[in-house]
Amino acid sequence: MSAGNGTPWGSAAGEESWAASGVAVEGSELPTFSAAAKVRVGVTIVLFVSSAGGNLAVLWSVTRPQPSQLRPSPVRTLFAHLAAADLLVTFVVMPLDATWNITVQWLAEDIACRTLMFLKLMAMYSAAFLPVVIGLDRQAAVLNPLGSRSGVRKLLGAAWGLSFLLALPQLFLFHTVHRAGPVPFTQCVTKGSFKARWQETTYNLFTFRCLFLLPLTAMAICYSHIVLSVSSPQTRKGSHAPAGEFALCRSFDNCPRVRLWALRLALLILLTFILCWTPYYLLGLWYWFSPTMLTEVPPSLSHILFLFGLLNAPLDPLLYGAFTLGCQRGHQELSIDSSNEGSGRMLQQEIHALRQQEVQKTVTSRSAGETKDISITSI
């Protein structure tokens, strides 16, 4: 029996992190470290290295002081928090998954079981809530570009606070279960925490809504408002502004080209969220309503679907890198446009001055001629 046959997600790591994670121990046949699990561990290590390097680079990039800015840009602050959430996934979820697949059973103490399951779910919540905060901020930046952005810190605090509170039940639901017999076996599961199966299903569905449905719905509403606002006739009419309008920007983040790149980045984050987590949660829903699916789905497929979820953390730094390059290109074009506009204004001023000099010379010469004629007539 492979290490993945005992869990709804096909792994001893307990991908069903909000409920019955881990390998069930009721059966007579214990799980093993299968070939599919070995491949999964190898891929997880690759994702860990890429995610850790990328998100640490993003965190360093967005937190270092910018000499051209008096205060940090809201966009940089948001992606600093998103990088922190991805690092929490990287350093909690990925090592836990790889180690648990290798050891097959739980080798740590009960307190470690409860704490790690709490941190794992908190990491998943934060990685789901912070893209929502980014979507709300982009909506405010597009609909009210000159408005106050003081609410960003409150939204970030709410996202982290909810992640902490919603993950607290893990501390009480998870515990270690020991199996006596010829081969002792210990696992970190929720066995015995729910008196009836419907209670466990209700908890799973509640967490599914908070982790996937609510963030997806909130982001869809935000970007729908943005698309409707951008596509409205008034917005299109006002979009053809002269280059001098950039001088009215109160910060680099409020400039139209930066808002456009930030909006594109936020949309890409939404798409990666959907592509990475939809297969993961669909498999979970299937298991909750049809537990016999464990015998119908190959373990290799379950491994692949879970790795799709882990892929989200390494992708975010790549998207931020593309955003940074786009902003730098837009900033260079903005500088060129501003310099060209300044040169054009100087040329117009010089031409106007020359014309004024020519007019003044003409008037002076005419005045001198009239004075000479008057003198001759008098003689």
From Swiss-Prot:
Disulfide bonds join 113-188. Keywords: Cell membrane, Disulfide bond, G-protein coupled receptor, Glycoprotein, Membrane, Phosphoprotein, Receptor, Transducer, Transmembrane, Transmembrane helix. Gene3D superfamilies: Rhodopsin 7-helix transmembrane proteins. GO terms for biological process: cellular response to hormone stimulus; G protein-coupled receptor signaling pathway. Glycans are attached at residue 101. The keyword Translocase does not apply. It is a multi-pass membrane protein. Receptor for gonadotropin releasing hormone II (GnRH II). This receptor mediates its action by association with G proteins that activate a phosphatidylinositol-calcium second messenger system. PANTHER family: GONADOTROPIN-RELEASING HORMONE II RECEPTOR-RELATED, NEUROPEPTIDE RECEPTOR-RELATED G-PROTEIN COUPLED RECEPTOR. This is Gonadotropin-releasing hormone II receptor. It comes from Macaca mulatta (Rhesus macaque). The lineage of its organism: Eukaryota, Metazoa, Chordata, Craniata, Vertebrata. The gene is GNRHR2.
